[in-house]
């Protein structure tokens, strides 16, 4: 597998409502954003850059030899922030930029490579992303779990917080929002959970801030729907299993710290 040249950009903002100062949270003696950058460095990326509007994050990165750029604080979405970084770095239109979320300290470097390669193999698409099959009906009906349906070529048809596709026969009589404890049969067709990892062409990132916000984007609160609303194609790479957990809450952080310690113990001195 020949992985194309690509740059990783890691957005990192301090203004998290559920976990204040999240990028600076300690994981094994280093800030979380540094741990994410270390995972990106272990991929085939030619360059890894943290994008932040917080001098404290930039300083933490500098202290650990991680490149960081300061961006405006008023970006309406993470993709708008990436667009500013692509411009700052002077990337060519055909350059590939992989957006690794700043709260994914356990992300597999191979997954980063794979999404970059997937975009390189789909010249008709401006974006590539990933998804995996769901096996738990509670996740299927959870609006915090984003689902995606694809066409025969593996391009996204739609992303939604709703359970899609709706299994008319299997879910006959099932309420739209069943109790989390309810046992709901899964349809024969896999329900795909979207993984929030993206590869973009830099030329698209430059165009993105000029695109008008889309009604579907605003209704679902999913910024990738703006790209689709304006006719851009998104290639979806399917993985067999879910990625390692990210960090949204204190409970997530505690879990990731435990997993990190376990992985270090397995590696040994």
From Swiss-Prot:
<dbReference type="InterPro" id="IPR004528">
    <property type="entry name" value="KdsB"/>
</dbReference>
<dbReference type="InterPro" id="IPR029044">
    <property type="entry name" value="Nucleotide-diphossugar_trans"/>
</dbReference>
<dbReference type="GO" id="GO:0005829">
    <property type="term" value="C:cytosol"/>
</dbReference>
<protein>
    <recommendedName>
        <fullName>3-deoxy-manno-octulosonate cytidylyltransferase</fullName>
        <ecNumber>2.7.7.38</ecNumber>
    </recommendedName>
</protein>
<dbReference type="GO" id="GO:0033468">
    <property type="term" value="P:CMP-keto-3-deoxy-D-manno-octulosonic acid biosynthetic process"/>
</dbReference>
<dbReference type="GO" id="GO:0009103">
    <property type="term" value="P:lipopolysaccharide biosynthetic process"/>
</dbReference>
<keyword id="KW-0548">Nucleotidyltransferase</keyword>
<keyword id="KW-0808">Transferase</keyword>
<keyword id="KW-0963">Cytoplasm</keyword>
<dbReference type="InterPro" id="IPR003329">
    <property type="entry name" value="Cytidylyl_trans"/>
</dbReference>
<dbReference type="GO" id="GO:0008690">
    <property type="term" value="F:3-deoxy-manno-octulosonate cytidylyltransferase activity"/>
</dbReference>
<dbReference type="Pfam" id="PF02348">
    <property type="entry name" value="CTP_transf_3"/>
</dbReference>
<keyword id="KW-0448">Lipopolysaccharide biosynthesis</keyword>
<comment type="pathway">
    <text>Bacterial outer membrane biogenesis; lipopolysaccharide biosynthesis.</text>
</comment>
<comment type="function">
    <text>Activates KDO (a required 8-carbon sugar) for incorporation into bacterial lipopolysaccharide in Gram-negative bacteria.</text>
</comment>
<comment type="similarity">
    <text>Belongs to the KdsB family.</text>
</comment>
<comment type="pathway">
    <text>Nucleotide-sugar biosynthesis; CMP-3-deoxy-D-manno-octulosonate biosynthesis; CMP-3-deoxy-D-manno-octulosonate from 3-deoxy-D-manno-octulosonate and CTP: step 1/1.</text>
</comment>
């Amino acid at each position: 597998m020949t992985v194309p040249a690509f740059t990783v950009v890691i957005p990192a903002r301090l203004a998290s409502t559920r976990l204040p100062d999240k990028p600076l949270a300690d994981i094994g003696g280093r800030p979380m954003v540094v741990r994410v950058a270390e995972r990106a460095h272990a991929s085939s990326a030619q360059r890894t850059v943290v994008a932040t509007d917080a001098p404290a994050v930039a300083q933490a990165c500098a202290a650990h030899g991680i490149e960081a750029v300061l961006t405006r604080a008023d970006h309406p979405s993470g993709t708008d922030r990436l667009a500013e970084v692509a411009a700052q770095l002077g990337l060519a239109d055909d350059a590939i930029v992989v957006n690794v979320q700043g709260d994914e300290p356990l992300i597999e470097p191979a997954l980063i490579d794979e999404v970059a390669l997937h975009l390189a193999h789909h010249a008709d698409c401006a974006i590539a992303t990933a998804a995996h099959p769901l096996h738990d009906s509670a996740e299927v009906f959870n609006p915090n779990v984003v689902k995606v349906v694809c066409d025969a070529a593996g391009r996204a048809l739609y992303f939604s917080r709703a359970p899609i596709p709706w299994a008319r026969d299997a879910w006959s009589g099932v309420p739209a929002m069943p109790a989390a404890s309810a046992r709901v049969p899964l349809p024969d067709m896999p329900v795909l959970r979207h993984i929030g990892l993206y590869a973009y062409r830099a030329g698209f990132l430059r165009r993105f801030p000029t695109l008008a916000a889309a009604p579907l984007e605003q209704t679902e609160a999913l910024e990738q729907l703006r790209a689709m609303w304006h006719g851009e194609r998104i290639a979806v790479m399917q993985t067999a299993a879910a990625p390692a957990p990210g960090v949204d809450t204190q409970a997530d952080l505690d879990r990731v710290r435990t997993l990190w310690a376990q992985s270090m113990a397995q590696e040994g001195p």
